């Protein structure tokens, strides 16, 4: 049963049993609680002493109507009650809930205006699966970083009121309670809200954690909050468009309130990867056949090439394929507005560090939790332990040749769509030659390429003989040794890859998690161990082959859940939301 709460409601009772109009009003504002099911809504009004002052059940046939901008009247027999809400916004939320409960169509919310109904239904249905929540919770980097950020900044939570947007299982709400929060309002629009309620009760936190079913754009809170927490990030940070819901929640935030995460940085850098480029072209060559069972398919090859190159590639890669220092685009969640994310334009100018073909742009993101005690970073950079967000690469149909010392400029433009994703337009030009290339991509339909094996370095990465070095070490040859003696640096500082730094937010503030001694800033050499296989505790066998991990397909990715595997290529709904060409895929 869904429950919503409204504070500051005034009650006026009106009757004419004796032929005279009689009025009685409660002097103090009341707390209104509305409990909804499919056929009825139960309305309970309580005073500050939590004594029930008025209770009724509103059915489809109950006589009721709105009065003015923020009042509602209900007639029960010979008497009527007038409910006056604290604000028009509160009344609008209450009125919409009541209309939906009575089988009427409510007013469209901001979320409904920006989202196709079919996309929203599939999205929230997917997040109602415990298996999907498990996949995200088992991302140790994600979950551990959130807990560390909250507990290390416990002064921001101690005796404070917290809002958890899109709480899912409620794990972040529990972290806030661990940090001493006085009250946590956990908002969840999927059926996972029921499971979160079970966990709250079983952990004896029902007095401090209140689960509120519904979309944050449509619910009401009984009070303003001191801090908002959420995990709204998708692929390339923006996919799923949940960041807009996160920003919308600021209507509940006190003027001096905080947000965890506080800022988000998107990084992009040019890369070279001939193998990936040829893979996409090779797949399209199926349609080049002049006689497939006697049918000429070649007329569709051009369309097939366009379709395959419209797919962003979700996987991880060796940092040495990057050809220039990354460009950073920052979103300050405390300052940004929802409409700022409708159209995101990222201009770039790369100073090429290596010569070769530029096959596209690689994207990843970092978010910072800027607390009163310390700043903690969650990074999805290719130098860091792998997360379920991986990295994303966008190919150019026509690669660009650039020399070391050249500059490549252009724009990455992200346009929000009603499928809870973005259409991506990339235009790039080598300034010295005038060579230009572009591509249009659909972030809703990525290609999941991650196989669980260690990413291969680009060709030409050895500056001494690996065979000779193998025997010079006495015949003992490990992966880390082999890379260490290849002539490449034994450590890469992330600052050499990620451009820009802030005065209050720096990479040096990132807190290492876990027991892996190579977890922080040890670069591609020592990260070999942590990046083999997949994320810890995800069920994927470390170092397993593609065939060992699940159904055979190039689109295998973290983690394969047989429950979500449908016909055709191997499909998992375990990563941030995206929809391959023949299925649905959500997650964050």
Swiss-Prot record:
The keyword Phosphoprotein does not apply. It comes from the Eukaryota. S-adenosyl-L-methionine binds at residues 133, 142, 166, 188, 217, 245. GO terms for cellular component: cytosol; nuclear replication fork; nucleus. Residues 473-588 are annotated as: Transactivation domain. Pfam families: CARM1 (PF11531), PrmA (PF06325), PRMT_C (PF22528). Its EC number is 2.1.1.319. InterPro entries: Arg_MeTrfase, Histone-Arg_MeTrfase_N, PH-like_dom_sf, PRMT_dom, SAM-dependent_MTases_sf. Gene3D superfamilies: Hnrnp arginine n-methyltransferase1, Pleckstrin-homology domain (PH domain)/Phosphotyrosine-binding domain (PTB), Vaccinia Virus protein VP39. It is found in: Nucleus; Cytoplasm; Chromosome. It catalyses: L-arginyl-[protein] + 2 S-adenosyl-L-methionine = N(omega),N(omega)-dimethyl-L-arginyl-[protein] + 2 S-adenosyl-L-homocysteine + 2 H(+). The keyword Transmembrane does not apply. Its main location: nucleus. GO terms for biological process: chromatin remodeling; methylation; positive regulation of fat cell differentiation; regulation of DNA-templated transcription; regulation of intracellular estrogen receptor signaling pathway; regulation of skeletal muscle fiber development; replication fork reversal. CDD domains: AdoMet_MTases (cd02440), PH_CARM1 (cd13330). Keywords: Chromatin regulator, Chromosome, Cytoplasm, Methyltransferase, Nucleus, S-adenosyl-L-methionine, Transcription, Transcription regulation, Transferase. Residues 120-427 form the SAM-dependent MTase PRMT-type domain. GO terms for molecular function: histone H3R17 methyltransferase activity; histone H3R2 methyltransferase activity; histone H3R26 methyltransferase activity; protein-arginine N-methyltransferase activity; protein-arginine omega-N asymmetric methyltransferase activity; S-adenosylmethionine-dependent methyltransferase activity; transcription cis-regulatory region binding; transcription coactivator activity. Methylates (mono- and asymmetric dimethylation) the guanidino nitrogens of arginyl residues in several proteins involved in DNA packaging, transcription regulation, pre-mRNA splicing, and mRNA stability. Recruited to promoters upon gene activation together with histone acetyltransferases from EP300/P300 and p160 families, methylates histone H3 at 'Arg-17' (H3R17me) and activates transcription via chromatin remodeling. Belongs to the class I-like SAM-binding methyltransferase superfamily. Protein arginine N-methyltransferase family. Homodimer. This is Histone-arginine methyltransferase CARM1. The lineage of its organism: Eukaryota, Metazoa, Chordata, Craniata, Vertebrata.
């Amino acid at each position: 049963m869904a429950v919503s709460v409204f504070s500051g409601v005034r009650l006026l009772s009106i009757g004419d049993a004796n032929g005279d109009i009689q009025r009685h009003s409660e002097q103090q504002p009341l707390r209104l609680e509305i409990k909804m099911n499919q056929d009825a809504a139960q309305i309970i009004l309580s005073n500050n002493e939590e004594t029930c002052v008025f209770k009724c059940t509103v059915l489809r046939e109950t006589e009721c109507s709105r009065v003015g901008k923020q009042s509602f009247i209900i007639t029960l027999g010979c008497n009527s009650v007038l409910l006056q809400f604290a604000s028009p916004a509160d009344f609008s939320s209450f009125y919409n809930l009541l209309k939906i409960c009575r089988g009427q169509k409510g007013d469209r919310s901001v979320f409904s205006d920006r989202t196709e109904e079919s996309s929203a239904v599939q999205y929230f249905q997917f997040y109602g699966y415990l298996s999907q929540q498990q996949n995200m919770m088992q991302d140790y980097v994600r979950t551990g970083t959130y807990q560390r950020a909250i507990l290390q900044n416990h002064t921001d939570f101690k005796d404070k009121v917290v809002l958890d947007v899109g709480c899912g299982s409620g794990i972040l709400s529990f972290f806030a309670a661990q940090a001493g929060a006085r009250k946590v309002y956990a908002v969840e629009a999927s059926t996972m809200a029921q499971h979160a309620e079970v966990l709250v009760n079983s952990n004896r936190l029902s007095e401090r954690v209140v689960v509120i079913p519904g979309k944050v754009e449509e619910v009401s809170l009984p009070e303003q909050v001191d801090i908002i927490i959420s995990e709204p990030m998708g692929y390339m940070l923006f996919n799923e468009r949940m960041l807009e819901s996160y920003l919308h929640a600021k209507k509940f935030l006190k003027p001096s309130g905080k947000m965890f995460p506080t800022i988000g940085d998107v990084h992009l850098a040019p890369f070279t990867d001939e193998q990936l480029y040829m893979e996409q072209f090779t797949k399209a060559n199926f349609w080049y056949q002049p006689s497939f069972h006697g049918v000429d398919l070649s007329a569709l090859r051009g369309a097939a090439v366009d379709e395959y190159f419209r797919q962003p590639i979700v996987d991880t890669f060796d940092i040495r394929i990057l050809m220039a220092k990354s460009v950073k685009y920052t979103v300050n969640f405390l300052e940004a507005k929802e409409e700022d994310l409708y159209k995101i334009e990222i201009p770039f100018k790369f100073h090429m560090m290596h010569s070769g073909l530029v096959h596209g742009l690689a994207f990843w993101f970092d978010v910072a939790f800027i607390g009163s005690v310390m700043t903690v970073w969650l990074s999805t950079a290719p130098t860091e332990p792998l997360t379920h967000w991986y990295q994303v690469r966008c190919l150019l149909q026509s690669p660009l040749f650039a020399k070391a010392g050249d500059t490549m400029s252009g724009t990455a433009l992200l346009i929000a769509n009603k499928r809870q994703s973005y259409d991506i337009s990339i235009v790039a030009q080598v300034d010295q030659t005038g060579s230009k290339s572009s591509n249009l991509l659909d972030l809703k339909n990525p290609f999941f390429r991650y196989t669980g094996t260690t990413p291969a370095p680009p060709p030409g990465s050895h500056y001494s003989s690996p065979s000779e070095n193998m025997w010079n070490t006495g015949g003992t040859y490990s992966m880390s040794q082999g890379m260490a003696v290849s002539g490449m640096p034994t450590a890469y500082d992330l600052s050499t890859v990620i451009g820009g730094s802030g005065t209050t937010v720096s990479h040096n503030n990132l807190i290492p998690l876990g027991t892996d001694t190579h977890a922080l800033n040890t670069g591609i050499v020592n990260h070999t161990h942590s990046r083999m296989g997949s994320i810890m505790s995800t069920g994927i066998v470390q170092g397993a082959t593609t065939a060992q991990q699940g159904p055979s397909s190039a689109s295998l990715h973290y983690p394969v859940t047989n429950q979500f595997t449908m016909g055709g290529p191997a499909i998992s709904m375990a990563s941030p939301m995206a929809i391959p060409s023949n299925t649905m895929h959500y997650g964050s």
